[in-house]
């Protein structure tokens, strides 16, 4: 029942999000930063200039698949997209929220700069429609693929360096 659905969500739709390393989450967050550079450059620039920890805030959004951040109806629509499209739907939703509500961040004084305004009051239909915008769809898919490829390359590099240090290679011991 419900537990099987949760296990499937964690294992298949969000691989690496809920394990001890959270590597899948870190890859998605790297992609998210790149997606925002493409889809909301002014907002991304302000976040960087203000030193706003997007990674820290997005952790809750992505791990909890927006259950604690969006109105329930919007969350359920995002989940529909997640089940259909996979984790890229979470990046598209976040990019859509920044696109729709980025003006609130751009106009906010730095002393009250709060990322929660991005998701507050999101209209369910509007956030889903915006997340399906071709520019957002392409940016999210491209940046997630790039981040995943970089992660695989880095993991291979680290594994190879570890094998060299221990004196082993793929074919066994060297020497």
Q: For the regions a protein language model found, what residue spans apply to each?
A:
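Helix-rich, well-folded core regions that mediate interactions or catalysis
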Residues: 1-175
């Amino acid at each position: 029942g419900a537990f099987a659905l949760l296990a499937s969500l964690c294992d298949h739709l969000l691989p690496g999000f809920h394990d001890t390393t959270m590597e899948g989450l870190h890859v998605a967050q790297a992609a998210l930063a790149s997606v925002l550079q493409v889809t909301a450059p002014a907002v991304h620039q302000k976040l960087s200039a203000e030193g706003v920890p997007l990674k820290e805030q997005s952790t809750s959004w992505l791990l909890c698949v927006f259950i604690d951040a969006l109105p329930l109806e919007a969350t359920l629509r995002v989940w529909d997209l997640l089940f259909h499209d996979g984790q890229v739907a979470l990046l598209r939703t976040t990019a859509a929220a920044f696109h729709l509500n980025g003006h609130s961040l751009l106009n906010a004084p730095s002393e009250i700069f709060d990322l929660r305004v991005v998701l507050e009051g999101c209209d369910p239909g509007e956030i889903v429609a915006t997340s399906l915008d071709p520019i957002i769809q392409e940016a999210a898919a491209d940046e997630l693929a790039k981040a995943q490829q970089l992660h695989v390359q880095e993991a291979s590099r680290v594994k190879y360096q570890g094998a060299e240090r221990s004196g082993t290679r793929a074919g066994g011991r060297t020497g």
